[in-house]
Amino acid sequence: AAKPLDKSSSSLHHGYSKVHVP
């Protein structure tokens, strides 16, 4: 569920945050 954009969100959560948080 990890997207290429999750590189930024991974700093906030884990890496799957894009699925939950935009």
UniProtKB/Swiss-Prot annotation:
A GO cellular component entry from the record: plasma membrane
Keywords: Cell membrane, Membrane
Region annotation Disordered: where it falls in the sequence: 1-22
Location in or out of the cell: Cell membrane
Protein purpose: Binds various plasma and ECM-proteins.
Name of the protein in question: 65 kDa membrane protein
Organism this protein belongs to: Staphylococcus aureus
Lineage: Bacteria, Bacillati, Bacillota, Bacilli, Bacillales
